[in-house]
Regions:
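Bacterial N-terminal signal peptides
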Residues: 9-21
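Sec/Tat signal peptide C-region and signal peptidase I cleavage site
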Residues: 22-26
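Acidic, Ser/Thr/Pro-rich low-complexity intrinsically disordered segments
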Residues: 27-86, 124, 135-137, 164-291
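Ligand-binding face of N-terminal immunoglobulin V-set domains in extracellular IgSF glycoproteins
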Residues: 41-51, 64, 81-130
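Histidine-acidic residue clusters that define the catalytic metal-binding segment
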Residues: 161
Length: 291
C-alpha cells in the first residue's frame, strides 16, 4: 500500500529526472554590425557581419530590389578583435561576449534604388533582427584598419568612406585637397544605421587651425558644411564624443564638393497639386523646382 510519503518521494524523483533530462535553452542568433555598412551602385563588396551564435556557417539574406548576397555567411578564420582578459573554460560553458566575424559578399545592381536595405541571418535556433545596409551613388572606400597612432589617409572627392572607431580612443583622419572659396559637405551616417557611435567631426585647415566642428546634427550623427578659407590640404578628424570604440562602432562618412541637399521648403505638398519647391543645400538650383 502506497503511503503519502512514498507518493511524495516518487513525485520528487520524477521531477528531478525531468529537470536533468530537459535540454538547455538554445541561444538565439544575433548580429551587431556589418562592415562596410554600404556599397555603391554597380559594385560587389566583401562584408564582415559581426554576430553571436551564428556558428561555422549560416544562411542570410538582404531584402529589397537590386541587391543580392552570398548564400551563406562563413566564420572568419582569423578573429582579430578582442579586448580584456581571456578566461579559459570548456567550450560547452563559454559564452559569446564578443561578436564573431562572419564573411559574405553583397552585389548591388547599377540601377538599384538608393537608400536602406535590411539584412537578416538565421539558423535552426532562430533568426536575428534585421539591420540596415546602405546603397549609395558616390565612389566608396573601406578603411584599412591598423594598430597604433592614426595615420592620415588621403581621399579624392566625392567619396563615401566606410570606417570603424576601434579600439577605444581611436581617431580616424582623412585628408583632401581643398580650394579657397569652395564649399564642402561632411556627413556621418552611423546612428541612423544602428551604430552606437556618437560622432564628432573636426576640420583642420592647411595652417593647422580649426575650420569647423560638429557633434550632433541628425541625432548623434555629425554634419557640417564649410567654405575653404585657403588652398591646401584639409584634415577631417572623426572620433566618438566620449572616446569610446568597439567592433560595432562603424560609420559612413561622405565628403563632397558637389550637389548636396539639406532640406526643402515647404516640407510637404498636397496630393494632386503642383508646388514650387525650394531646394536648400550645396550647389543646388537657386530657382524653385515645380513638383
Amino acid at each position: 500500500m502506497l503511503t503519502p510519503a512514498t507518493v511524495r518521494c516518487a513525485a520528487l524523483a520524477v521531477i528531478s529526472w525531468l529537470a536533468l533530462a530537459s535540454p538547455a535553452p538554445a541561444s538565439s542568433p544575433s548580429t551587431s554590425y556589418i562592415f562596410p555598412a554600404g556599397a555603391q551602385r554597380g559594385t560587389t563588396v566583401k562584408v564582415i557581419v559581426g554576430g553571436h551564435y551564428l556558428y561555422e556557417s549560416c544562411p542570410w539574406k538582404m531584402y529589397g530590389v537590386g541587391i543580392t548576397t552570398s548564400k551563406n555567411l562563413r566564420l572568419a578564420e582569423r578573429q582579430g578583435w578582442f579586448e580584456g582578459p581571456r578566461i579559459p573554460m570548456p567550450a560547452s560553458q563559454a559564452g559569446e561576449s564578443y561578436p564573431k566575424d562572419q564573411l559574405g559578399t553583397v552585389t548591388v545592381d547599377k540601377d538599384a534604388p538608393l537608400g536602406f536595405r535590411y539584412y537578416q541571418a538565421w539558423n535552426s535556433e532562430g533568426i536575428a533582427a534585421g539591420r540596415r545596409f546602405v546603397i549609395g551613388h558616390l565612389p566608396e572606400i573601406v578603411e584599412q584598419e591598423i594598430d597604433g597612432r592614426p595615420i592620415p589617409t588621403s581621399v579624392k572627392l566625392p567619396v563615401t568612406i566606410n570606417g570603424r572607431i576601434f579600439p577605444r580612443e581611436d581617431v580616424d583622419i582623412w585628408t583632401f585637397t581643398g580650394k579657397k572659396g569652395s564649399s564642402y559637405v561632411c556627413e556621418v551616417n552611423a546612428a541612423r544605421i544602428g551604430s552606437p557611435l556618437d560622432s564628432r567631426l573636426e576640420i583642420i585647415g592647411p595652417d593647422g587651425g580649426r575650420v569647423a566642428e560638429n557633434t550632433d546634427h541628425f541625432g548623434n550623427d555629425s554634419y557640417l558644411r564649410f567654405t575653404a578659407p585657403a588652398d591646401g590640404t584639409y584634415r577631417v578628424r572623426i572620433h566618438d564624443l566620449k572616446f569610446l570604440g568597439l567592433q560595432p562602432y562603424i560609420y559612413r562618412l561622405t565628403i563632397t564638393d558637389g550637389p548636396w541637399g539639406e532640406q526643402t521648403y515647404p516640407l510637404g505638398v498636397q496630393r494632386g497639386t503642383k508646388t514650387a519647391l525650394h531646394l536648400l543645400g550645396q550647389r543646388l538650383p537657386a530657382k524653385p523646382v515645380t513638383v
